Amino acid sequence: IPQVKLGIVAVSRDCFVLSLSERRRRAVVESCAKEGTSLYECKTVVESENDVAKAVAEVKAAGCNALVVFLGNFGPETPEALLVKEFGGPAMIAAAAEETGKDLINGRGDAYCGMLNCSYNLGLRKLKAVIPAYPVGTADGIAGMIADFVPVARAILGLSSLKIITFGPRPYDFLACNAPIAPLFKMGINIQENSELDLFEAYNKHKDDPR
């Protein structure tokens, strides 16, 4: 069973205060700790495409195999989508809700609108990420979303390293004939389908094998 090591990367649109994303990211990490969910807090905040490589390198160096992309404010559309692409593993995206209406200069996140743009950008790029049913929340709410993401990430990691060896009507290495199992290939599963003749041949080759 794959062991999931989560990392969280905050993103910030450069017309917002970067410290807002940092503060909200820390709050999410603290809430996760209270819930018993361990995750690595990436110190790089992604504002531009130049930050993406740095953030991915940081979480990879920490051994993370699953990622939470956290919109601490509106978020930069292209860099956050590239973050999902370049990381290459299971990724969840969630966004911060505004804590109060009393600080609309330095405390305005506008993350709900950013979440809409992010999901559309992912669709245009044909990238896959887990988006919770209600992806905008407080630190405690997002900690709950992250806890729910862990078993999903575990399943994705397990399937991505799965190899299925089957015996059916199609001979080995006839990928063009395997349209019915195409959805499995799309999930990253490696499939080797052998024909009944392949099975018969293998059986004969191992005749009298003491194993």
State what each model feature region is.
Residues 1-211:
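An N-terminal assembly and electron-transfer interface module characteristic of large anaerobic redox
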